[in-house]
Amino acid sequence: MSLKHFLNTQDWSRAELDALLTQAALFKRNKLGSELKGKSIALVFFNPSMRTRTSFELGAFQLGGHAVVLQPGKDAWPIEFNLGTVMDGDTEEHIAEVARVLGRYVDLIGVRAFPKFVDWSKDREDQVLKSFAKYSPVPVINMETITHPCQELAHALALQEHFGTQDLRGKKYVLTWTYHPKPLNTAVANSALTIATRMGMDVTLLCPTPDYILDQRYMDWAAQNVVESGGSLQVSHDIDSAYAGADVVYAKSWGALPFFGNWEPEKPIRDQYQHFIVDERKMALTNNGVFSHCLPLRRNVKATDAVMDSPNCIAIDEAENRLHVQKAIMAALASQAGIGNRE
């Protein structure tokens, strides 16, 4: 049997994702379990985290397991990922050894590695995550690289809870770009587009100009999901028409890919669109829609205080659900035949 990882949700069937969400809902009602008893996970962070680290550490503990946090370049050796490299620079270990050694110690490996924001053609290859999956003898979990599949499931669960059903078909879903003073990763936007179309919703990607449309890979995933799950997909640059009648508004900021690695000329363009902030006027156009965001969020930059403090904001519910869906993911991966068997 081939080893199953959790690198992105497109690799999992809809039935498998539904099973994870069902299990996550059960974990939400019953916090403690023994699914990871005697098992461990290495959480490898190349970038900072609050929710991801906290929820994975606590999730492993609540299921009877143990988490070890590693930060290469800080409390662990810097890692080389290119084959054939003469390692006479800053890196001390090659991923071929790192992943295999960790796999002898632990039962799961989580990886968080953001793009370097220099060359999108390289960053979109997701080298760090794919290298861990290539060499690791145990399942690897994407804790956010160029997608954020754990956030996807937390978001989906929050929507199912709010609407009181697992069937989200027919809901109008707006994924809106919002302003941020810095160009940010497209990971959460890629993932939101993916899961919303996977759930069969009518999805509108709202962004200022065509330069802010997401990478074609994720647009293609979304189009494929529309065919398989129903729903629809459109791109809009018109704020009012996009918000009109929306059931869900999901906000995220990201840098324009044509300027990737050359951000200076992108900034004055981005600065023109600060009015994309999610505010009461825009939310009033919706169908009493819910608002959410992956967090962290800069108040009164991405969304106003009034929107964040509204009873229609489910961002905190979504953040809580990170704990529950990640427990479901860890439990499912650790249950594979041979995982945890050191004999």
Swiss-Prot record:
GO cellular component entries: cytoplasm
Activity regulation, short description: Carboxylation at Lys-302 increases the catalytic activity of the enzyme.
UniProt superkingdom: Bacteria
Protein keywords: Amino-acid biosynthesis, Arginine biosynthesis, Cytoplasm, Transferase
GO molecular function annotations of the record: amino acid binding; N-acetylornithine carbamoyltransferase activity; ornithine carbamoyltransferase activity
Family annotation (Gene3D superfamilies): Aspartate/ornithine carbamoyltransferase
Main subcellular location of this protein, as a coarse class: cytoplasm
Reactions this protein catalyses: N(2)-acetyl-L-ornithine + carbamoyl phosphate = N(2)-acetyl-L-citrulline + phosphate + H(+)
Biochemical pathway: Amino-acid biosynthesis; L-arginine biosynthesis
Single Gene Ontology BP annotation: L-arginine biosynthetic process
Amino acids binding N(2)-acetyl-L-ornithine: 144, 252, 295
EC number: 2.1.3.9
Residues annotated as site: Key residue in conferring substrate specificity for N-acetyl-L-ornithine versus N-succinyl-L-ornithine: 92
Binding-site list for carbamoyl phosphate: 49-52, 77, 112, 148-151, 294-295, 322
Record-listed N6-carboxylysine modification sites: 302
Record-linked Pfam families: OTCace (PF00185), OTCace_N (PF02729)
Function recorded in the entry: Catalyzes the transfer of the carbamoyl group from carbamoyl phosphate to the delta-amino group of N(2)-acetyl-L-ornithine to produce N(2)-acetyl-L-citrulline. This is a step in an alternative arginine biosynthesis pathway. The enzyme has no activity with ornithine.
Subunit comment: Homotrimer.
Family according to the record: Belongs to the aspartate/ornithine carbamoyltransferase superfamily. AOTCase family.
Protein name (record): N-acetylornithine carbamoyltransferase
Species whose genome carries this gene: Xanthomonas axonopodis pv. citri (strain 306)
